[in-house]
Amino acid sequence: IIITDHFCDDYFPDIKTLYIPLEGLSNEESSMILNTYKPICHLSIERCGQNAEGRYLNARGVDIKEFTAPVDELFKKGSQTAPSFGIGDGGNEVGMGSFAEVLNNKELFYDYCVIPCDYPMIA
């Protein structure tokens, strides 16, 4: 199953896709999704995630929260039950919180995503 937002409509026509609304999911809705589909892993590819202030910043440091469904909230919850993988290249992606010690260097990076994962990969 693919879990994304409506900005990715029709990207996966042959795969069951759930669309997270921009306002996010309740705790009960998140639990229902995880209990229904019982994922064997969680994979985030180049997905913007929250920084320490709860903001979603693009690669230029611009806040894009109004265009970003909080899929990372479901990722955090799911990562407690199955291995998680995050692929990113700018520090603002889900999973890059695993590199917090490096990304905390403000001379090199703006506010990075704080959501870690089990297996982060740099693209």
Indicate residue ranges for each PLM-predicted region.
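Conserved mixed alpha/beta catalytic, RNA-binding, or beta-rich assembly cores of soluble enzyme
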Residues: 21, 41-123
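Active-site charged/polar residues at nucleotide-handling catalytic sites that mediate phosphoryl
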Residues: 37
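Short internal beta-strands
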Residues: 1-6
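A glycine-rich helix N-cap at a beta->alpha junction
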Residues: 12-34
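Short Asp/Glu-rich motifs
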Residues: 11-12, 96
